[in-house]
Amino acid sequence: MASFKSLGVTNHVIQGLEGLSIFKPTEIQIQSIPRLIKSPIDFIGMAQTGTGKTAAYSIPIIQNIDFTEPKIQALILCPTRELGQQIAKQIFKLTKYTEKIYVEAVYGGEKIEAQISSLRRKTHILVATPGRLLDLQRRKVVDLRPVSYTHLRAHETRE
């Protein structure tokens, strides 16, 4: 049986997983984590709701962030603010025991000035809805040139 350690997950991230009561990898995590930790490749992963997709793509992102570089290195685009908030919260919890990796979530329905202020601080991982990201780019607040990792999160569907 696979373990997070056998997938190449660091002890610090495993501690974060355990803090979320996640002890064994799911199928989507077993298929994606080792591949994505090795190198940023194009990867399409599909799995049911509640199977750990967020951890499947965010763990490799977290482990490949250079925390000494104060720039946005990963972009996660998501369709709704609720999903963006959820993703940012989980990444924050996963990084609890790592070197300081900073995640910011930006989305409509909140004051853009507060989000601009947050982005002036060090941000490594940006979680954004498309509309708010475009608005911030038009204002020249977000520089995506240093981004090495991009994840497009699809909307959950129930069948």
Question: Which role does the model predict for each range below?
Answer:
Residues A2-I44:
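Conserved pre-motif I regulatory segment
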Residues G16, L20, R35, Q48, ...:
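Amphipathic alpha-helical segments that mediate coupling or scaffolding at interfaces
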Residues L17, Q29, G45, I61, ...:
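Residue-level signature of catalytic and energy-coupling elements of molecular machines
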Residues P34-K38, A55-T68, F92-K93:
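Walker A/P-loop NTP-binding motif
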Residues K38, D66-P70, K96-T98, S117-R121, ...:
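Conserved catalytic network of the ASCE P-loop NTPase/AAA+ motor domain
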Residues D42-Y57:
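Walker A/P-loop
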Residues K71-D135:
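Conserved nucleic-acid-binding Ia/Ib motif block in the N-terminal RecA-like helicase ATPase lobe
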Residues T150-E159:
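Conserved small/polar residues in nucleotide/adenosyl-binding loops
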